[in-house]
């Protein structure tokens, strides 16, 4: 089953998100009812050649932020930076924007 790059999979059982917000073409975040910090999704280019039957959500990779400090919810400011080890995407969510490292 293919997944659209237009929007991350926000309806996983137990991980239903609200308030999905696009930071870049490849990075989104949203809110879980039971968590004070946002959940992030990244469309990982490193997974582009992986067969669909080996992927759970297309090239979308989730990142929880429970170990991060939520400085502000609106505009979003989260510390420290986020790093996706799958491909090395690294940066900060500050003032409601994504800032590359």
Residue spans of the language-model regions?
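Short, Lys/Arg-enriched phosphate-binding patches
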Residues: 45
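A short Gly-Trp-Pro
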Residues: 1-41, 49-101
């Amino acid at each position: 089953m293919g997944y659209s790059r237009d929007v991350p999979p926000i309806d996983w059982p137990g991980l239903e998100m609200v308030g999905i917000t696009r930071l870049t073409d490849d990075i989104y975040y949203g809110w879980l009812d039971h968590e004070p910090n946002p959940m992030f999704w990244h469309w990982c280019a490193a997974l582009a050649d992986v067969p669909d039957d080996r992927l759970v959500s297309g090239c979308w990779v989730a990142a929880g932020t429970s170990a991060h400090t939520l400085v502000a919810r609106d505009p979003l400011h989260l510390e420290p930076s986020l790093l996706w080890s799958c491909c090395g995407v690294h940066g900060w969510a500050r003032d409601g924007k994504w800032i590359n490292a």
